[in-house]
């Protein structure tokens, strides 16, 4: 259906959808080839990775001790192009969220004395305090006096004259601090008419009372201009971040444009305000208008935000090493432990799944996950494509993703306590490559050491019985054994050695 043939209601819906799509579209910037530079800075990891394509012919059984935790890359700029740019950023501090302006409330009053004199010289004196109108210019030009004590003037009295006035004008000045709206650069106070004022002096709800600020217009925080780089994707040319040496990176994947201090700024992913002027001759970058007027003003609290991905990497590697130690020691694995070996970076990586109680390992292409559907059956990658999760040939998901018929997203759900119980049920591995030393601690902290082979404890000479062997031999053999035992009883028996033969461990190549 073409646009001219659409009904009016459908046209309105189409325009609303088009406007929403345009407002959320990400800004692209294709730098000139001569402006591209080599630059290296670390960047955030994706929230989750999953295999999108696996090479099934590469999967083979792997022994538990041969498992390896994924490599953590230092450079996260694969697939990005860097170009020089001039970056202006506003020096916002946490206290700027309560930016205040000093001033005073100015009140003009008149102290009046009225005198009336009668025929016989009697006097009537009346004293009044009157509200006196005051103009903007008068309020702005008034200079505050440290100490000004009001008083009534001496009465002026004349015979047979009534209401002779003697007046004196005073200005009452009271210190008053108001809030500054850094978006519109206006003074904000409930005392003002309309709740705000663009320029001092500001009229108040009280008659003839003005608020006078130390400066006519609110001041804005300082602006720093530095040379930096902007990063764009090589394939889509979408802007991902801006970097200035000595400052944390500014993410621009969800950036938008906002008016702040009567100027247009780019609000970054985490709420900072910057402006970007590329050095390749193009104009300043403009982005879609923000849907709200919120600036987080993180300030110095976020100077270490660029270390977030490093902290996440260390935590993931520690969890992986603990999972590896547990699998090797117990010769058991659960989907939860297997999920710790998932690579945190997109690209070629090792994937694992369970098949017939054996860990299978092979090569897969991992991609970043940007969003997960409500029923968790599909996901959206960084390119905006909705796809289904890749499952192994046995129906189990890679990296411990599928438990029965339920899709479990490791790492994204572990802090929400919605893991299925099946994620934590350990499965005994069918193939045990070598004996393992298992140390158990009881309540008295004593240590019992045993050798496990195929899950059975080898007790040398302990709880051993002859009956299974005697049941299958002849009577003559039994009599011969009794005779030999009678002869051996005359010799003093030596103490049995119940120690564990260490050659058993050595001959099998135990790795401790």
UniProtKB/Swiss-Prot annotation:
Gene Ontology BP term (one): symbiont entry into host cell
Gene: G
Keywords: Glycoprotein, Host-virus interaction, Membrane, Signal, Transmembrane, Transmembrane helix, Viral attachment to host cell, Viral envelope protein, Virion, Virus entry into host cell
Family to which this protein belongs: Belongs to the novirhabdovirus glycoprotein family.
First and last residue of the signal peptide: 1-25
Organism: Snakehead rhabdovirus
Residue ranges, Virion surface side: 26-463
Membrane topology per record: Single-pass type I membrane protein
Protein name: Glycoprotein
Post-translational note: Glycosylated by host. Glycosylation is crucial for glycoprotein export at the cell surface.
InterPro entries tied to this protein: Rhabdo_glycop_CD, Rhabdo_glycop_FD, Spike_prot
One of the Pfam families matching this protein, by short name: Rhabdo_glycop_FD
Predominant place of localization: virion
Compartment(s) where it occurs, according to its Swiss-Prot or TrEMBL record: Virion membrane
Residues annotated as transmembrane: 464-486
GO cellular component assignments: membrane; viral envelope; virion membrane
Domain of life: Viruses
Functional note: Attaches the virus to host cellular receptor, inducing endocytosis of the virion. In the endosome, the acidic pH induces conformational changes in the glycoprotein trimer, which trigger fusion between virus and cell membrane.
Intravirion compartment segments: 487-512
């Amino acid at each position: 259906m073409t646009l001219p043939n659409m009904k009016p209601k459908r046209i309105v819906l189409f325009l609303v959808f088009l406007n929403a799509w345009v407002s959320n579209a990400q800004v692209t910037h294709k730098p000139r080839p001569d402006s591209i530079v080599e630059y290296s800075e670390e960047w955030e990891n994706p929230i989750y990775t999953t295999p999108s394509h696996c090479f099934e012919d590469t999967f083979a059984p792997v022994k538990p001790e041969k498992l390896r935790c994924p490599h953590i890359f230092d450079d996260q700029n694969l697939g990005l192009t860097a170009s020089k740019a001039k970056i202006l950023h506003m020096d916002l501090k946490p206290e700027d969220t309560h930016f205040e302006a000093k001033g005073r409330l100015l009140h003009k009053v008149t102290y009046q004395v009225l005198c009336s004199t009668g025929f016989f010289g009697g006097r009537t004196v009346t004293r009044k305090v009157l509200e006196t109108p005051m103009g903007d210019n008068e309020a702005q030009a008034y200079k505050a006096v440290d100490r000004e004590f009001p008083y009534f003037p001496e009465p002026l009295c004349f015979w047979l004259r009534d209401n002779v006035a003697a007046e004196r004008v005073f200005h009452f000045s009271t210190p008053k601090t108001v809030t500054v709206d850094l978006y519109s650069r206006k003074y904000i106070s409930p005392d003002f008419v309309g709740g705000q004022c663009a320029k001092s002096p500001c009229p108040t709800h009280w008659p003839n009372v003005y608020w006078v600020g130390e400066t006519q217009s609110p001041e804005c925080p300082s602006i720093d201009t530095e040379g930096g780089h902007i990063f764009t994707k090589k394939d889509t040319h979408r802007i991902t971040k801006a970097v200035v040496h000595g400052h944390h990176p500014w993410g621009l994947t969800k950036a938008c444009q906002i008016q702040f201090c009567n100027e247009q700024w780019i609000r970054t992913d985490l709420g900072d305000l910057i402006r970007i002027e590329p050095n390749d001759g193009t104009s300043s970058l403009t982005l879609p208008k923000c849907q709200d007027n919120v600036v987080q003003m993180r300030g110095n609290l976020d100077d270490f935000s660029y270390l977030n991905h490093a902290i996440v990497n260390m935590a993931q590697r520690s969890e992986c090493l603990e999972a590896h130690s547990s699998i090797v020691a117990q010769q058991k694995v659960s989907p939860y432990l297997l999920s710790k070996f998932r690579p945190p970076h997109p690209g070629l990586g090792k994937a694992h799944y369970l098949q017939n109680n054996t860990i299978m390992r092979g090569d897969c292409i991992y991609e970043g996950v940007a969003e997960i559907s409500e029923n968790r059956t599909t996901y959206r990658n960084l390119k905006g494509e909705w796809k289904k999760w890749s499952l192994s040939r046995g129906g189990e998901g890679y990296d411990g993703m599928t438990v029965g018929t339920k899709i479990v997203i490791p790492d994204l759900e572990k802090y929400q306590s919605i893991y299925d119980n099946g994620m934590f049920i350990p499965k005994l591995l069918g193939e045990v490559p070598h004996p393992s030393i298992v140390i158990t601690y009881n309540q008295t902290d004593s240590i019992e050491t045993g050798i496990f082979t195929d899950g059975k404890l080898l007790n040398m000479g302990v709880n051993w019985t002859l009956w299974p062997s005697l049941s299958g031999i002849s009577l003559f053999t039994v009599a011969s054994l009794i005779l030999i035992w009678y002869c051996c009883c005359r010799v003093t028996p030596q103490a049995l050695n119940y120690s564990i033969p260490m050659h058993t461990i050595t001959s099998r190549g135990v790795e401790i």
